[in-house]
Amino acid sequence: MSKFSFNEQTCIGCGACVRICPKGLIHMDTDGPKMDEAASKRCNNCGQCVAFCPVKASMQEFSKGIELEDALIYDPRRAPTILKFIKSRRSERLYSPDPVPHDNLMRVLETANYAPSGGNNRTIRWIVFENPEKTAELREMIAEWFDTVCRTHPVYSKRYAIDSILERYRGGRDVILRGAPHVAYVVGPENAVWGPVDTGIALGFFNLACEALDIGCCFAGYATKAGEWEKVAQFIGLKPGEKVWCAICFGKKAAHAVRIPYRGKVPLTLL
């Protein structure tokens, strides 16, 4: 069965789907665009044919029965607001203890799911600590990782000020997860060529989606590295052959930025 079809009643035969397919899998036949079965085996459901059809005639088997949203049409009047929104994003280290509502969490994850990936292979998987009590367990487990594994680790024993971290943590200052009620891990196959890149892009989408709902984020390096420890890996539900690519902590903001700090000149070479 072909992964591509079209509405014969609305198709205008413009060939947009043919031109836009990244792999050239669609061709124009006498009665409209076609994707044969051999080509379908190479189709990775990227959705370009559906996205760019001007009359919404192109269809994917993959999204059959799903009501598709209209894309936001470019409007130059929105550009200043969108650019300022992106620049206004800050790493959040002060959180409300109240958990993020489930519906908002799912809106964020559904948006992050649209992040591009190498070859549209989409190999990453999300593990999200929605329950703050589970987050507290993870936090304590990371402290244990510092006090055991890190002390004898050839790199981490030198990289981290372990005694200082643990002293502040045990004194009531959460320098491990910054008091965040939630943590999200991005994991995937350990042999995924574009795993680190796909993860960075996905977390960028996640972070900006959070900002749209007044949720703050901070990349969680300690949680990421602790994911190498078998005890943490088992606790978060890592599957055989998977590895932790990165973690991010998040929650409702307890503080809001009022200005955008200067970042200096762009390090740049134009060729």
Segments from the language model and where they lie:
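Small-aliphatic-rich amphipathic alpha-helix that forms the alpha element of a beta-alpha
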Residues: 12, 108-112, 182-184, 189-235, ...
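Short linker/helix segments within small regulatory modules
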Residues: 31-44
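Iron-sulfur cluster-binding cysteine motifs and their immediate structural context
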Residues: 6, 16-32, 48-65
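Non-catalytic interaction/regulatory modules that flank or connect domains
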Residues: 110-117, 124
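Extended interfacial segments that mediate partner engagement and assembly in macromolecular machines
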Residues: 70-113
